[in-house]
Curated annotation (Swiss-Prot):
The gene is psbC. It is found in: Plastid, Chloroplast thylakoid membrane. It is a multi-pass membrane protein. Residues 1-14 form a propeptide. The keyword Chloroplast applies. It comes from Crucihimalaya wallichii. One of the components of the core complex of photosystem II (PSII). It binds chlorophyll and helps catalyze the primary light-induced photochemical processes of PSII. PSII is a light-driven water:plastoquinone oxidoreductase, using light energy to abstract electrons from H(2)O, generating O(2) and a proton gradient subsequently used for ATP formation. The lineage of its organism: Eukaryota, Viridiplantae, Streptophyta, Embryophyta, Tracheophyta. This is Photosystem II CP43 reaction center protein. GO terms for molecular function: chlorophyll binding; electron transporter, transferring electrons within the cyclic electron transport pathway of photosynthesis activity; metal ion binding. GO terms for biological process: photosynthetic electron transport in photosystem II. Keywords: Acetylation, Chlorophyll, Chloroplast, Chromophore, Manganese, Membrane, Metal-binding, Phosphoprotein, Photosynthesis, Photosystem II, Plastid, Thylakoid, Transmembrane, Transmembrane helix.
Length: 473
């Protein structure tokens, strides 16, 4: 009975809808998958599957290089990046390349170099993909056992997982080294309106870094998305890189424990579903980060966040009316609350009016005007700098609102420009992609579990109703 049970539980079934599984060939008869099922035809052809993945990487890197050069070719240094529909150059600028004080672009050559390097890399990957798809061995197990695998070989699968984790850890440390040793990164909080600087005082305190994970995801807490300190971002990459590398070594050296062998499904489609779930989580987190966070995604490059644009409008009109003689500390608005300033429920002085709901915004142009109890009235009267006025006026008219068909801005704002914020594009696209990846996870997880349990859902293609219907023409 024991043998029967373990066979039933772990018997290796790839989810084919018909046909038998054969090694040779990539057609429907030998694999059970039609041409449009793509890589499913290559489930047991490790060499060809390698070709497909390398070619896919080549396409990704080619897009990055081509789009990078396209943005460089269209870039106008006199306009902010976020007014030009750029999504790649802001990332390069955030890494400290080509920018100076205040986020001003002083050199576009690093951006050109980045584009060319990606194009060259994509050519190498493209060649490798075509080679392995067309010329290389169909399977790697015989000639290159280190790179070969069988999907149900749990030990080999966790070894591959370990290698991937180490590579991810190395990637995290690349950012750390850039910030510490290779020119630094752009810090929007640098005094006077942001600058590129090297990170000098990493505290590495686990209570600080992992404290973010324990925060509530709502309101003034904001979970990990609330990070507003460049040191903490780089420290986080030190911790995460270390965990990934040590976890990778652990998975290479160990075999899966009994509980893991029992709990997980060990098939190619199951691993696909796990990967899709992980990518989905990454997409949703990236969506929240680019929408709310103005430290990892500086507003100088990505435009203001929604709360930031709203608070900037309140600040701009406070500055204007104060110059015209208004007493901003006591003026009443139409609701009886303060017109310019009011108190939050916990007693801080905050901007009044509709923007009161964004009272917990932190932004580099605003923080110098705060005291121990919120906005400081004496600083608002005496200490406002011209750069703060300029920046808030700019952010006020560039709210990340509007539809993705380029009719942007606040509908009632007479000074609005035809503009859609990169934050709108990046957060929307990552939410949508994260959602579709999650649906893909559910789909492939369901199929993988059904196959592992010994039954499969689906139509037998030999008897599809469509085969007996009159052709459309």
């Amino acid at each position: 009975m024991k043998t029967l049970y373990s066979l039933r539980r772990f018997y290796h079934v790839e989810t084919l809808f018909n046909g038998t599984l054969a090694l040779a060939g990539r057609d429907q008869e030998t694999t059970g998958f039609a041409w449009w099922a793509g890589n499913a035809r290559l489930i047991n052809l490790s060499g060809k599957l390698l070709g497909a993945h390398v070619a896919h990487a080549g396409l990704i890197v080619f897009w990055a290089g081509a789009m990078n050069l396209f943005e460089v070719a269209h870039f106008v240094p006199e306009k902010p990046m976020y007014e030009q529909g750029l999504i790649l150059l802001p990332h390069l600028a955030t890494l400290g390349w080509g920018v100076g004080p205040g986020g001003e672009v002083i050199d576009t050559f690093p951006y050109f170099v980045s584009g060319v390097l990606h194009l060259i890399s994509s050519a190498v990957l493209g060649f490798g993909g075509i080679y392995h798809a067309l010329l290389g061995p169909e399977t790697l197990e015989e000639s290159f056992p280190f790179f070969g695998y069988v999907w149900k070989d749990r030990n080999k699968m966790t070894t591959i997982l370990g290698i991937h984790l180490i590579l991810l850890g190395v990637g995290a440390f690349l950012l750390v080294f850039k910030a510490l040793y290779f020119g630094g990164v752009y810090d929007t909080w640098a005094p006077g309106g942001g600058d590129v600087r090297k990170i000098t005082n990493l505290t590495l305190s686990p209570s600080v870094i992992f404290g973010y994970l324990l925060k509530s995801p709502f309101g003034g807490e904001g979970w990990i998305v609330s990070v507003d300190d460049l040191e903490d971002i780089i420290e986080g990459h030190v911790w995460l890189g270390s965990i990934c590398i040590f976890g990778g070594i652990w998975h290479i050296l160990t075999k899966p424990f009994a509980w893991a062998r029992r709990a997980l499904v060990w098939s190619g489609e199951a691993y696909l579903s796990y990967s899709l779930a992980a990518l989905s989580v990454c997409g949703f987190i990236a969506c929240c980060f680019v929408w709310f966070n103005n430290t990892a995604y500086p507003s100088e490059f990505y435009g203001p966040t929604g709360p930031e644009a709203s608070q900037a409008q309140a600040f701009t009109f406070l500055v204007r009316d104060q110059r015209l003689g208004a007493n901003v500390g006591s003026a009443q608005g139409p609701t009886g609350l303060g017109k310019y300033l009011m108190r939050s429920p916990t007693g801080e002085v905050i901007f009044g009016g509709e923007t009161m709901r964004f009272w917990d915004l932190r932004a580099p142009w605003l923080e110098p005007l705060r005291g121990p109890n919120g906005l400081d009235l004496s600083r608002l009267k005496k200490d406002i700098q011209p750069w703060q006025e300029r920046r808030s006026a700019e952010y006020m008219t560039h709210a990340p609102l509007g539809s993705l068909n380029s009719v942007g801005g606040v509908a009632t704002e007479i000074n609005a420009v035809n503009y859609v914020s990169p934050r709108s594009w990046l957060s929307t696209s990552h939410f949508v992609l994260g959602f579709f990846l999650f649906v893909g996870h559910l789909w492939h997880a369901g199929r993988a579990r059904a196959a592992a349990a010994g039954f499969e859902k689906g139509i037998d293609r030999d008897f599809e109703p469509v085969l007996s219907m009159t052709p459309l023409n």
